[in-house]
Amino acid sequence: MLTRPHGTILLCSIANFINSADQVVMPIAIVAMTDEFKWGLHGQGWVLSSFAVGYMSSQVIGGSAAKKYGGKKILLLSVLLWSMSTFIVPFFAHSIFALTLSRMVLGFGEGLGLPTIYHIFSHTIPCEERSRAFGYLVALGSIGQTMATVICAHLNWRWAFYSFGSLGFVWAFIWIYFYKENRSSNDEEFVEPPKVNNINVHWSEFICHWPLWSIYIAHFCMNWSNYIIMQWLPTYLLRSLNGNKSDIMLTAAPYVLNSVVGVVAGHFADSLIVKHKWTVLSVRRLMTSVGLMGPGLFILFFSAVNNLPLAVLFVTICLGLSACNSSGHLSNHAEVAPSHAGITFAISNTLATIPGIICGPLTAELVTQSHGRWFPVFIIAAGVNFVGAIIYLSQSAASQVL
């Protein structure tokens, strides 16, 4: 049985691989689906954003349920739910209303996943290995996005949903057989006890501490630009930079670099703490600064060029640097709230999903009002990143507050 940290990291990272792959299928497939069903730009925006409605609604449920019933059961439920919802998309594609509902269910299932994984990691992964653990988690997610981008470009859009929807069922069998929770309780054992074991915390405590809000805001700002890239990059390359369908494969490049940087940044961050004796707070602030300010700068470069290869290069660097956040604010939950990391991440991810809901329709409206120009979309995204970095640098902490 895989009870050791490395086995836990592997299985959870594979789950995130499938999670991230399933998220990318629709932004790729929607180009062909739009040609077949004659959807307008606003219709596409709502289809893309409906996922985020379900995703946001289940974050706190996932963190709380994992704490009460154990991570194994909730992560299994999450993967099965989002996999089924991916598999059945072709059956609902004839109706935007039905498709929107199925996308919400997909989002609800995926929304249970990451808070549950954070709960599992905070209870089973030692502090000095957490940056690497979250680095691998993010890296496998990026690899999933990369593979989905490349494979979906060569598949009929219906088979794209069938193929990636099936992966979760295979993972479920492996998870049931290999992952074993502590039988003595519904909760995994802490690998290191928290300084203060605050089991019963009032809900108001989760929104009353600036170190927590610095994490929430940084996560929100990171996702603003990430959602724009994930949702609209294929459409932008095809419609604005005159790319062709084979150029869609170029959108895999950002996810490749993201996966590499996620792993490298994790090892680098842990080495700063263990070998070079940096404080945990200094490392979290450094990695978050690079992960927010770097993408903010390169998304401005991306918006200023009309050359497709150069645009892909800039957006690749943008998403690559964003992976540094996995060793920054995304790893900070287990330090400020070790007993409640699943719930704090759920709150953070709920707020960070708001851009996923509004960026689709907002982008469509901004581009329409700007007569096809995308610059306002990207300048806002860059500004949001810079604001997030400043707030995290000034308000973050690495000591326990809950």
Q: What are these model-predicted stretches?
A:
Residues 7-41, 229-234, 359:
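Extracytoplasmic
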Residues 24, 52-60, 111, 145-146, ...:
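Residue-level signature of mid-helix packing/kink "hotspots" within the transmembrane helices
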Residues 26-27, 209-266, 325-326, 330, ...:
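Extracytoplasmic gate region of multi-pass secondary transporters
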Residues 57-97:
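Conserved MFS/SLC helix-loop-helix module at the cytosolic interface between two early adjacent transmembrane helices
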Residues 80-94, 289, 293-306:
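C-terminal ends and interior cores of transmembrane alpha-helices
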Residues 85, 97-112, 298, 309-325:
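Hydrophobic core of transmembrane alpha-helices in multi-pass small-molecule transporters
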Residues 102-141:
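Cytoplasmic helix-loop-helix junction between adjacent transmembrane helices
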Residues 137-183:
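Helix-loop-helix hairpin linking two adjacent transmembrane segments in secondary transporters
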